[in-house]
């Protein structure tokens, strides 16, 4: 067994692992990264964020073609199979792997591909994919192994028609009808993707409202547009059993309902990838969801072991994971790059997309904060009209007295881009955070960004 010595060893090469490794090596530390795949990038690149967003983009282009009156003069609507659309995602994945591999090589970070488990608090044993066993000794470790779909034991995921959010990328045909169980972010995104391909989707939600953490108006808008695209949403339902057949799948619900479809997608919960890390060898325990607890510096109960990304739970976003990993390394190298990552914008890539940051109306009302609302509807924006994207709005919540921007909520075309303007203002201290910024700033025209000016005027006109 070969033994290698490092300052920092990072377990996982997804966004959190990459952020940690890059920050540590830039501070002069000798760094190694271990990943259980033969390529870097983590679940985000290979099975999660990148392929699903590439899929969404392709489906959205198909929908635009089929609904744009300009193209109706050319020919009939076109439909593509799921495998055809998936090919574009595979190209993006390949490019992302190439880019990220070059990052590690350029920064002289050693990469090991295999399964790592702790021998003690100062070392891990790596069973490499080629069968060799290596021992990595380090002063500090960062656990960034990510998460995987939670799989209930009573569902047969080996059945050829039953999928989770990882295996759905192996779907080799376009089903006529699909059941998606779990109406969280992943479930809603895939409901948009498959309905955009003409699939009849039953979306099963065990709550009363879709994505209840969102502003109520945004959540209601999402429900409307999913239904408008032939997604049947069933709220307050729980599964009793999933019956796999040769020609389909039957979902038995506790309410007594039975639903049959050609394919079944389970998207209800995720679990941290900690079960193979040998945490018992160092006295570190994961919770029932496979997640490890950390303090505000991303340090676990073991002083030299840190964790970041999905493996620590909320918010389980790739964007937050990168910053958490970078901050964990910042705590190790003490280069003033540490911060507790809590100003995370929500980006949900449904069709249309959603993004928000800060408080929503429900939270502000419960906290008895006097706020006002400013709105800009995309149907009135020149850029949205030019782009044939009339659906959506920008909503700004601000304090009635101080004019401080308290929340920004966006639904529609380029929402995940638009939100960052509001985020930048909300991060300013004192009077610099003011809704008046938007009325005193010249925006390019026509742009989606000018929705901030329209919404700001709308909100200020409500004051008296």
Curated annotation (Swiss-Prot):
Cofactor(s) recorded in Swiss-Prot or TrEMBL: FAD
Alphabetical UniProt keywords: Cytoplasm, FAD, Flavoprotein, NAD, NADP, Oxidoreductase
InterPro entries, per database record: Class-I_Pyr_Nuc-Dis_Oxidored, FAD/NAD-bd_sf, FAD/NAD-binding_dom, FAD/NAD-linked_Rdtase_dimer_sf, Pyr_nuc-diS_OxRdtase, Pyr_nucl-diS_OxRdtase_dimer, STH_gammaproteobact
Pfam families according to UniProt: Pyr_redox_2, Pyr_redox_dim
One GO BP: 2-oxoglutarate metabolic process
EC number: 1.6.1.1
Name under which the protein is recorded: Soluble pyridine nucleotide transhydrogenase
């Amino acid at each position: 067994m070969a033994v290698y010595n490092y300052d920092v060893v990072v377990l996982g090469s997804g966004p959190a692992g990459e952020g940690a490794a890059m920050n540590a090596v830039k501070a002069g530390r000798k760094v190694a990264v271990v990943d259980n795949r033969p390529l870097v990038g983590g679940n985000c690149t290979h099975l999660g964020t990148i392929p699903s967003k590439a899929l969404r983009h392709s489906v959205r282009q198909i929908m635009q073609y089929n609904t744009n009156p300009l193209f109706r003069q050319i020919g009939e609507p076109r439909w593509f199979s799921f495998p055809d659309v998936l090919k574009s995602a595979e190209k993006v994945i390949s490019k992302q792997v190439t880019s990220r591999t070059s990052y590690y090589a350029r920064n002289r970070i050693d990469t090991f591909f295999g399964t790592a488990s702790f021998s003690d608090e100062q070392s891990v044993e790596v069973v490499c994919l080629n069968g060799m066993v290596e021992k990595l000794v380090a002063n500090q470790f960062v656990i960034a192994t990510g998460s995987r779909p939670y799989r209930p034991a009573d569902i047969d995921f080996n059945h050829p028609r039953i999928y989770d959010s990882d295996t759905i990328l192996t779907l080799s045909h376009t089903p006529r009808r699909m059941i998606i169980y779990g109406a969280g972010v992943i479930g809603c995104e895939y409901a948009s993707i498959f309905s955009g391909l003409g699939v009849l989707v039953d979306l099963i939600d065990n709550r009363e409202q879709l994505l209840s953490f969102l502003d109520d108006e945004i959540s209601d808008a999402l429900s409307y547009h999913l239904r408008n695209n032939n997604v049947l949403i069933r709220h307050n339902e729980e599964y009793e059993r999933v019956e796999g057949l040769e020609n389909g799948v039957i979902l038995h619900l506790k309410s007594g309902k039975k639903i049959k479809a050609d394919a079944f997608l389970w998207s209800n919960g995720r679990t941290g990838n900690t079960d193979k890390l040998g945490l018992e060898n160092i006295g570190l325990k994961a919770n029932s969801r496979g997640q490890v607890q950390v303090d505000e510096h991303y340090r676990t109960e073991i002083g030299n072991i840190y964790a970041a990304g999905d493996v620590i739970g909320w918010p389980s976003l790739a964007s937050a994971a990168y910053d958490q990993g970078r901050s964990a390394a910042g705590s190790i190298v003490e280069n003033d790059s540490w911060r507790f990552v809590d100003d995370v914008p929500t980006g949900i890539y449904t069709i249309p997309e959603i993004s928000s940051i800060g408080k929503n109306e429900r939270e502000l009302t419960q906290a008895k904060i006097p706020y006002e609302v400013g709105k800009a509807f995309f149907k009135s924006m020149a850029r949205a009209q030019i782009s044939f994207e009339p659906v959506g709005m920008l909503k700004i919540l601000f304090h009635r007295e101080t004019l401080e921007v308290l929340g920004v909520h966006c639904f529609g075309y380029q929402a995940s881009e638009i939100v960052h303007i509001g985020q930048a203002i909300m991060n300013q201290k004192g009077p610099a955070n003011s809704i008046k910024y938007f009325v005193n700033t010249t925006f390019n025209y026509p742009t989606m960004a000018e929705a901030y000016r329209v919404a700001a005027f709308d909100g200020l006109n409500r004051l008296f």
